[in-house]
């Protein structure tokens, strides 16, 4: 609540006691007061009982809202006509806000409000009152209902549902055109005074707009407001209660008004004359430039349609309106030729597509401009006299025959000689060739229609002065047919004749094919090369013929196969013919003529044995052979003697060492089994680098028993070899034929050694890493022992 509202409320309460008294404020309603009524009821003993109706005595209560006093606000008083004033009655209040918002004095019946009440939250309260006897606690009056009405004060200002409104109105509108209506609401009681009567006024936005005081309708106040000059307006509207009088509360809102566009501006070209250039080689449909007329309007009101209305280039050029950019795109309509014409003039018009009749007086809504188009010369490629060529030639022409000529010219003002060539990608077999000077196309190989009926060639014409300028043209060569192929059998015929055949029996129907394609279609004739006593040919005159028997019965044991030469000829010029040989087998047939066996096949198959049975027999024979081979292979395997007798025996086991050396191709593996079987030792080969003085026969030791321990056996053999005089010396110089880098370590051999063991220093062994520590300790320890 504002300070202004609070002062008004305070003045109202100060003046209130002078104008009204409690009796006036809490005046009894027009409802008649309940009176005490009596009625007589006869008793059974003849006495008459009197029953009295008692009634409440109270006023209808009114309470002023927004009370700001420090004490409880007095509402009114409840009183019963049974109350004698001795305090014997007790008043009880129930209903809306009883005990919280409203309290009652139990003895006097006075009702008070405990806090400030807002009528806008609740306009009236319904309560119930009851009076009981304090001693008996029985009601002396029936419970009755009453209403406390809240009197309104002007404590609410008018409010708008929206803080900011958005509205629009067409530009160029007449005065008084409705824009938008704003409505404010006042929460005060409209039936009590002028607290809720709202009047509208405009605080900002004059002189362009006005508002109706009673309705809040905003209207235009100036005529012909132009959007192109100003588009946005901000209007502030005030709503004030108390009928707009002094002391009324008010609220404001903002209305943003936009002037919408109307078509009140025609299109205008920025230039009277526009110059464009285009190459004469530009293909049809090429965009050569654009024109654009400006329109101050927006949206559909600025849409423009372009057209060519006059000029000498109306047949050569066209214009298309681009909807997105509102430009007129000028395109090539027909092929251009610099040598024919070098300059064209067009008159282009731009016109609005949507015109508002209300603004015809501002028209016309169109404009024109002149477009001059200059054609620029380019070095054009040669031009053929036709877009394509078709030549027809018979397939039997001689090599080198001219089949046709192509012609081309240079369209430039300064013409250049033309050179012709064939695109070899279209003539991979090089069947054709072309004269480079005059364009004559001729054959370089024989033609064959049966291999290819059409040849699609590409001829290239290029300027001699500028070989990059080339043109291609398609040349179609159709090969015409010549009767150069003889007819042949259509398929291979497997023909048989039954032994019991009779004369005139049909055994085969034959047909023929020809690779040629005569104009009148194929027509073949069939006949025998010579008279045959066994068979004859009957021509059906439909490019087929029937093979018939001429005698009664055939014997396959005497003659199993007959060869019948048949002559097939065509009717084209020159006539072509060929002889096809028909192989006829003699077969045994049943009474129905169905073949049972023929020629050699009958001799191989026994009587009554079918082909399926023969296949089954062959499969059984193959299976038996496989079983025999497998059994023989198993029998040939011999059981080898095991070398390892127990898990502890490590003989012939693989032991892996981290040694480097030659592979299997460079080294010869030692067979430890030879320790147990000395007879398996290979003969010792003499070394080439040592010449022995005496040759000794190697000693042979007996074979060790199988149960001999390996260690004892090796020690025994080692002792024998130590005592063997034929064994080579331990220190001997061996020369190997391979190349390699020298070792940084000196030779450990005593041969060819320039120092003795005592003079050799082995300290460098310690520098070789941890793997050689043991070796360094062995040699280092020897020196220390010797010194000690």
Curated annotation (Swiss-Prot):
One of its GO terms (cellular component) is glutamatergic synapse. It is found in: Cell membrane. The modification Phosphoserine is found at residues 784, 788. Residues 635-788 are cytoplasmic. Disulfide bonds: none annotated. Residues 55-613 are extracellular. The chain crosses the membrane at residues 614-634. GO terms for molecular function: beta-catenin binding; cadherin binding; calcium ion binding. Pfam families: CADH_Y-type_LIR (PF01049), Cadherin (PF00028). Keywords: Calcium, Cell adhesion, Cell membrane, Cleavage on pair of basic residues, Glycoprotein, Membrane, Metal-binding, Phosphoprotein, Repeat, Signal, Transmembrane, Transmembrane helix. Predominantly expressed in brain. Also found in adult and fetal kidney. Very low levels detected in prostate and fetal lung. Its main location: membrane. Residues 55-160, 161-269, 270-384, 385-487, 488-606 form the Cadherin domain. Residues 1-22 form the signal peptide. Glycans are attached at residues 256, 438, 456, 534. It is a single-pass type I membrane protein. GO terms for biological process: adherens junction organization; calcium-dependent cell-cell adhesion via plasma membrane cell adhesion molecules; cell migration; cell morphogenesis; cell-cell adhesion; cell-cell adhesion mediated by cadherin; cell-cell junction assembly; homophilic cell adhesion via plasma membrane adhesion molecules. Coiled coil: none annotated. The keyword Transferase does not apply. Residues 23-54 form a propeptide. InterPro entries: Cadherin (IPR039808), Cadherin-like_dom (IPR002126), Cadherin-like_sf (IPR015919), Cadherin_CS (IPR020894), Cadherin_Y-type_LIR (IPR000233), Catenin-bd_sf (IPR027397). Three calcium ions are usually bound at the interface of each cadherin domain and rigidify the connections, imparting a strong curvature to the full-length ectodomain. PANTHER family: CADHERIN-10 (PTHR24027:SF290), CADHERIN-23 (PTHR24027). Cadherins are calcium-dependent cell adhesion proteins. They preferentially interact with themselves in a homophilic manner in connecting cells; cadherins may thus contribute to the sorting of heterogeneous cell types. This is Cadherin-10. It comes from Homo sapiens. The gene is CDH10.
